[in-house]
Amino acid sequence: MHAAVIGGGPAGLMAAEVLARAGVAVTVYDQMPSLGRKFLLAGRGGLNLTHSEDLERLLGRYGDAPPLLRKVIEAFPPDALRTWSEALGQPTFVGSSGRVFPKDFKTSPLLRAWLRRLSEMGVQVRLRH
């Protein structure tokens, strides 16, 4: 089986990673000359990855969130995101606001590590498509 992921932003890259882990051959297509450009732009203001509050309180921030949103967040809660980042060699910390940040406040090392992992998993990339 082969999957095409359209868009190389965080959602597309995570989709590619999940599919590749499941044994699917993946190609990521993006119209830009490199992946993760908006991710890098978001980091200019100090990228917060998630929030450290407990899951029910976090979900409460979404009001009457659709059941699908609840299932998605429960499947990949904030602690799992922190573990994922740390497995990429990018430790995190909780700021005074409760938000979780990369320890060095930079997105580029996180993105490079993520792209390296995807490459090692066999994910193919087609840019300017």
Region locations from a protein language model:
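Feature captures the FAD/FMN-dependent oxidoreductase FAD-binding
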Residues: E74-H129
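Glycine-rich NAD(P) Rossmann-fold beta1-alpha1 loop
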Residues: G9
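N-terminal Rossmann-fold NAD(P) dinucleotide-binding loop
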Residues: G12-L13
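Glycine-rich FAD pyrophosphate-binding loop
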Residues: A4, A20-R44
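Glycine-rich active-site loop/strand segments that organize a redox cofactor
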Residues: G46-V94
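Short, hinge-like loop/turn segments at secondary-structure boundaries
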Residues: G43-N48, L111-R112
